[in-house]
Amino acid sequence: MKNIIIASLILVFTSNSLFAQRLKNSSSSTIGYIESGRVKSSNGATIGYIQDGRVKNSSGTTIGYFDTNRIRNSSGTTIGYFEDNRVKNASSSIIWYVEDGIVKSSSGSTFGYFEGVRRIEAVLYFFFFFY
């Protein structure tokens, strides 16, 4: 199993621990991280957290969750899923995949990578909206 990132509208963090797992883009700039159960932006501001399998924003509102390999929004609508180390949208089109630790778009171009992730024991998801 490998680490996966959905980019553009959603970033998904996968890690085995909660200590400063950094998400970097293809230019090696840190664009976010998870630390002690908090999801933080690259400047260290807390923008959300994970609690009881729910993804919550900094106000405590549930904005998404993970359910049987499906990524769902807070209304329960499937917006994507994981299959064979591929991240697919609700229409089953491949959005992103991981190859040798590098996160690539469906066209094969490099998007970014994870730093500090050793092995997967727990899966943590947080949804960032950049647009």
Where are these regions (language model features)?
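Long terminal segments
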Residues: K2-I6, V12, N16-R38, N43-T46, ...
